[in-house]
């Protein structure tokens, strides 16, 4: 095994012993390279010498002289202790990298420089003195940079500049003061896993092309089903491109379970189907209904209480109404952690109703599923074990890098029967291994990204207790924020009571509005406060928090905490920053 000090740039011989007898030189290599045709020799010499004289090119101007960078050594020892020679990327293009002949050294040099750019960005992401975003309006970015695609290739110096520019204007989602979305933070193990996944660059449809990843998906989904509460982790599941697709999978499977003929005959052979979900549920239920031909009018929205929880009596009433009209209720989607309020529907009561009327029960726990990792908070999902299917997004509350969403199904084989098409060029039945590990035919997609490795590697690094600590910390920070602002001058809570999740919903009331009566004029003026403060946050780059209206409530801030880097001091900063930016409104 090579010692830790052998370094990134070392090239091991086949037996790992190295060869110290033939040191070689850049000059010797350059002389050999001149025998190659097509300009390869000149490019290799430029690579070896860096600041050497540029080769002449007929019929065109010379590229601008670029800063030389250190690259792989010029000797042939494996490993060696030579100092790295200079690389001038103005002479190099993507065609000089692997799999090009002699592309190893420029490839290592290029990827090392890309890695340096990425690592600098990672470090800056956690620096509170840096901006969350260097905001520019779309027309400014379009005018300042040429983003158009060209017919001719650019050199690698320009490619590296594009990498830097892209990250310069990207949102630092790992910044401790980024609270804008449900998915925040930047986990180092998850990041490493994502790099590995991209390097492996394989598909998830069969065991033969993704043996380890397929097994990890099997192990991880089984563990998630155990945590849900299904005996022995039995059932099925798949990682999908996001919670919206996971929810649509659930609708497809529920429909197939009730009417398996839909797979061949389509919706024309079915009665009108009706799905039920709360008025605070995610819009993906209606999108799924539209995509599946069920229609958005066939998604009935159930009333919620003042905390955003589905009212079971209204659910039962609407089911009976649909049945009286001759419609067929086929799915109830309860939400465990709504997007805005963070509400948890009463799953036990919903399960009783679904059992009574023989309706598929789905739980959209995309946001709230992470609480199942916490012994302190998992009670909020009591009844999830009675669901027929569950959506769970580890890329939200568990901090796994995007994307990582799972659909879990209680009945094994149902997903396969619903979606399989028996493509013989992929799913041959006479393979030499257990075909149950060829999982691709149960997916809607053919090409499917490897999403499991990030979650699996983070789970190995943290353990279940590590995820639990993260969840508990985030909910404690949410309660800390709530306790500060609930009685603070200039703040009004959108609903009474401490947060159910990490969602803290509130209005900031500027001094000019604090003495006004609670009437239409005040509401109209208040609706403009959050958008202006949010715009100022982005222009200063200090923090980011989302806002939205909901029902008859005008724009309010929705603070969500899933960022592992956030601390009590960041919550204090947020409050002070909102007051600073909104004081004059």
Curated annotation (Swiss-Prot):
GO MF terms here are:
glutamate decarboxylase activity; pyridoxal phosphate binding
What is this protein's record name?
A: Glutamate decarboxylase 2
Tell me the organism: Homo sapiens
Q: What's the chief localization of this chain?
A: cytoplasm
Q: What family is it from?
A: Belongs to the group II decarboxylase family.
Q: Reaction(s) catalyzed by this protein?
A: L-glutamate + H(+) = 4-aminobutanoate + CO2
| Keyword set includes Cytoplasm | yes
Q: How does it assemble?
A: Homodimer.
CDD domains documented for this protein: DOPA_deC_like
Q: Which residues carry this modification: Phosphoserine?
A: 3, 6, 10, 13
């Amino acid at each position: 095994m090579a010692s830790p000090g052998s370094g990134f740039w070392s090239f091991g011989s086949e037996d790992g012993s190295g060869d110290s007898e033939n040191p070689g030189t850049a000059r010797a290599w350059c002389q050999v390279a001149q025998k190659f045709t097509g300009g390869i020799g000149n490019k290799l010499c430029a690579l070896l010498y860096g600041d050497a004289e540029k080769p002449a090119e007929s019929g065109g101007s010379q590229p601008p002289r670029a800063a030389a960078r250190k690259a792989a050594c010029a000797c042939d020892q494996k490993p060696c202790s030579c100092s790295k020679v200079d690389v001038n990327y103005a002479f190099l293009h993507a065609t000089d990298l692997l799999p090009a002949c002699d592309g190893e050294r420029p490839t290592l040099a290029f990827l090392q420089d890309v890695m340096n750019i990425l690592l600098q960005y990672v470090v800056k992401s956690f620096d509170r003195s840096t901006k969350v975003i260097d905001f520019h309006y779309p027309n400014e970015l379009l005018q300042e940079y040429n983003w158009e695609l060209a017919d001719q290739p650019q050199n690698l110096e320009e490619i590296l500049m594009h990498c830097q520019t892209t990250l310069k204007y990207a949102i630092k989602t790992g910044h401790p003061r980024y609270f804008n979305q449900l998915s925040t933070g930047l986990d180092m193990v998850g990041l490493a896993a994502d790099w590995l996944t991209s390097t492996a660059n394989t598909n998830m449809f069969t065991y033969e092309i993704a043996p380890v990843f397929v097994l990890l998906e099997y192990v991880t989904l089984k563990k998630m089903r155990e945590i849900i509460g299904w005996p022995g982790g039995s059932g099925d599941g798949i990682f999908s491109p996001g919670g919206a697709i996971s929810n649509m999978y659930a609708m497809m499977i529920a429909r197939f379970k009730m009417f398996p003929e839909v797979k061949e005959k389509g919706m024309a052979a079915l009665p009108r189907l009706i799905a039920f979900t709360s008025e605070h549920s995610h819009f993906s239920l209606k999108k799924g209904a539209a995509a599946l031909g069920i229609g958005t009018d066939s998604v009935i929205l159930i009333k919620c209480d003042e905390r955003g929880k589905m009212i079971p009596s209204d659910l039962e009433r609407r089911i009976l109404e649909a049945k009286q009209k001759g419609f067929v209720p086929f799915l109830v989607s309860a939400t465990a952690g709504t997007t805005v309020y963070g509400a948890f529907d009463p799953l036990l009561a919903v399960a009783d109703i679904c059992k009574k009327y023989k309706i598929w029960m789905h739980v959209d726990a995309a946001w709230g599923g992470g609480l199942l990792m916490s012994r302190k908070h998992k009670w909020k999902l009591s009844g999830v074990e009675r669901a027929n299917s569950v959506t769970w997004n580890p890329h939200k509350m568990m901090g796994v890098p995007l994307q990582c969403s799972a659909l879990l199904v209680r009945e094994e084989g149902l997903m396969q029967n619903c979606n399989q098409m028996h493509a013989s060029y992929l799913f041959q039945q006479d393979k030499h291994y257990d075909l149950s590990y060829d999982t691709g035919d149960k997916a809607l997609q053919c090409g499917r990204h490897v999403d499991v490795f990030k979650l699996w590697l983070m789970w190995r690094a943290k353990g279940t207790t590590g995820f639990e600590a993260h969840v508990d910390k985030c909910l404690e920070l949410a309660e800390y924020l709530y306790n500060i602002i609930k009685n603070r001058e200039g703040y009004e809570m959108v609903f009474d009571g401490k947060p159910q999740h990490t969602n803290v919903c509130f209005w900031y009331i500027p001094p000019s509005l604090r003495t006004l009566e609670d009437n239409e004029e005040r509401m109209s003026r208040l609706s403009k406060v959050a958008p202006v403060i949010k715009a100022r946050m982005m222009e200063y780059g200090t923090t980011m928090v989302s806002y939205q209206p909901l029902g008859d409530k005008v724009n309010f801030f929705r603070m969500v905490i899933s960022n592992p880097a956030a601390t009590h001091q960041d919550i204090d900063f947020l409050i002070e920053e909102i007051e600073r930016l909104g004081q004059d409104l």
